[in-house]
UniProtKB/Swiss-Prot annotation:
This is Protein FAM181A. Coiled coil: none annotated. It comes from Homo sapiens. The lineage of its organism: Eukaryota, Metazoa, Chordata, Craniata, Vertebrata. PANTHER family: PROTEIN FAM181A, PROTEIN FAM181B. GO terms for cellular component: cytoplasm. Residues 1-14, 129-142 have a biased composition (Basic and acidic residues). The gene is FAM181A.
Amino acid sequence: MPLEERRSSGERNDAAPTNHRRPGEKRASTAKQVSSVPFLGAAGHQQSLPSSWKASCSGPLVMASDSDVKMLLNFVNLASSDIKAALDKSAPCRRSVDHRKYLQKQLKRFSQKYSRLPRGLPGRAAEPYLKRGSEDRPRRLLLDLGPDSSPGGGGGCKEKVLRNPYREECLAKEQLPQRQHPEAAQPGQVPMRKRQLPASFWEEPRPTHSYHVGLEGGLGPREGPPYEGKKNCKGLEPLGPETTLVSMSPRALAEKEPLKMPGVSLVGRVNAWSCCPFQYHGQPIYPGPLGALPQSPVPSLGLWRKSPAFPGELAHLCKDVDGLGQKVCRPVVLKPIPTKPAVPPPIFNVFGYL
C-alpha cells in the first residue's frame, strides 16, 4: 500500500470519532505513524516526503537516516582503531644496530680467544705454567736448605743452585717465542715445521757439567777433570752419615752440585752414590747393614743396584777420626745425566703433576 493512501485512510479514521480536533493535531498524529514505520526502506521513502510536510514536523520526532548512522559508526571505529594502534606502537629505535656486523665481531673475538688455548684444556691458559715454575723454585730451595746442620754450611752450593745458567737460558729461550707468537707456540695448533722453536729444541740436552763414562770407567776424551776452578763448598766435611738419611727427590739431587774429590776416580764416585739414600717415585731407600747382600759382579755398576756398598769399595772415602779406628763416611751426591730437557713444554708440565 502506498504511503499516501495509508496516510489518507488514517486521516479518515481519526476524523470519524473526533471531529472537534484541530488540523494541526491531526497532522502531528500522522507524523507519529510515519516515523514508526516498521519495515526497511522506510527511511528512503521518508527522504522523498514533501518539503511542506517536513517543515511542519517538530525536531525531536525526526530519526536520523541509516546512512548517517553507518557513517558515524565507521568514523568512531576508525578513530578508535587509530588511537589503539598509536598507543600499541613502540617508540622508534634511536640507534640503528647492524646485527650481522655485531655477530661477526663477536665470533671473531671468541675464535681468537679460544684459539690461544690448548685443545685438551679449554678452561686453562698458558699462564699457570709460568706461575708453576715460579712456585717450584722456593720448594727446591727449602729442600736444599733441609740437610744443612750447621748455620754457615753449604752457602756456596745454595748460590750455585739458584744461579743455574743453563736452566735460566732454556727458560728464556722458551718464553721468547711464546711472547712473539702466542698462537704458534701452542702444541697441536701449527705443524712442527712451521713453529717458532728455539735452536736448542732440535739438539740433545747438554747440561753444563756432565760426565762421559767410557768403557774403562774414566772420563771421556773431550772433557777434563770437572770443577777445577771452583772452590769447595764450606762446612760439608763435618757432616756425618746421620744427615744422609734425609729423603731427597731426584730433581733436588740433580740440581745440587757434586763435591770436589781430588784423587778419586769416577768409578769410586759412582760406587759411593750407592751408600746415599736415593728416592725414586716417592719411595725412600735407606742403607742396610754392610755386607748384607752378595757383591755385585761388576763393581762399576754400583750406581744401579739398591744394595749398600761394601767396605772394600768405600775404603778410599772413609777416614779415621783421631786414630781411634772410628770411620766417618762423607756424603757424596753425583749429578745424574739428564735424559730430557730441564724445562718441559707447558702441556706436559700440566699433565705431569695431576
